[in-house]
Amino acid sequence: MGGNKKSIRPIPLDVEKEIKSSKFIGCEKCGGSGFIAIKKDGYDFQQPCDCYRTYQLNMIKERSNIPEIYVNAAFDLDKSVSFMRFRPLGYKDELREIDGVKVNRKQLYFKKPIELNINGFGQQYVDIAINDLNASPRTISRSLILSGTVGSGKTYFACAIANEFINRGMNVCYLKTKQYLDNVIKDSFTKDEQKVRELKKKRDYLNGFNKNLKDNCHLLILDELGYEYQKADNNFALAEIKDLLRNRAEKSLPTIITTNFMLDELTRTYEEELVSMFAQSYMFFYVVCSDDYRIKKSMDLDKGFDFDSLME
C-alpha cells in the first residue's frame, strides 16, 4: 500500500544553496545534487554522496585555521621523537617571592615519566576522545598539555590529532595564543568615534567567535601557551585564557595546549586555580626530538633536485 512508503526527505536549505553555487556539478554518482536516493525497508531516503562528504570535510578543514604547513600532519613521527607521560604526584607548598613579597604557592610534582610510542598514542587518543564526546551526557574531557623545546614536533603532533578529528567529521579550531589575545585585547579607551565603532563591531564578532570556541568546537588546539606573559596587561590576558579553558572544561570539550614551558615551570608560573584545572582535566606530556624536527622536515625540500649534476 502507498501508506507504507515515506516520501523522500528534502535536501537541507544550506545544502541547496551550495548546490546552486555549483559545488557538486560534475559528480556522476549524484548528478550534481550532492545526495543519492536510496531505498531501505520500503522507505525512500536521501543519502549524502561521497562528493558532499568530501566537501564537508574540506569546509571543516578550512574553518579549522590549521596553518598550511600542518594541513597534512599525520601520525608519522619517527623514532627521533621521544614522548614521555608525566603523571601528577601531588602538591607541595613552596615559598616564592613575587614583586618583593614572599608568598606560599603550590607546585604540582610529577612521578617518573613513562616513554610511549607517540604515533600509537595519537591513534588511541583520537578514538577515546571522540568516544567521550559522543557520550550522553559527556562526563569527561581528556585534554593534553604538550611541553617541549622549540622544534620538538609538539605542534606537528597536535595538528596530526586535529586532522584525524577532521577526517571523522569533528569541528576543530587551531589558535596561536598570540593570535587569540591580539584579537581579544584592544584599546577600549580611544576617543576616535570611528575606531570605537570598529572596535565594537570586532568585539561583537569576537563574542560570537569565543562562544563558538567554548560551546561548539569539538577540539581546540591552543598553541604556544605562555605568550600572555609577554603582554603589557598580562593579568587581563591570563583572565581571557583562564575563562576560555574553564568553559571548555565545564562542557567536557577537549583542548590540546602546546607550550615551551617545562612542566615544573608551567605549574610554578600559573595560579593555583589554573594549575588545579590542569591536574584534573589535562594529561601532561613532554616531547623531545634528538634533532630539530622542523629541520628534519625541511629535508623534503631537496626532493626532486639532482645537486650532484650541478656541482662544478
In which residue ranges do the predicted regions lie?
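Short glycine-rich substrate-engagement loop in P-loop NTPases that contacts/grips substrate
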Residues: R87, P113, I118-Q123, I166-N216, ...
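A short, basic N-terminal segment
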Residues: M1-Q124, Y293-E312
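Walker A/P-loop nucleotide-binding motif
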Residues: I140-A158
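P-loop NTPase Walker A phosphate-binding motif
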Residues: T155-M170
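Loop/turn-to-beta-strand initiation segments
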Residues: M170-N171, N216-L219, K251-I257
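Phosphate-binding P-loop
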Residues: I128-S141
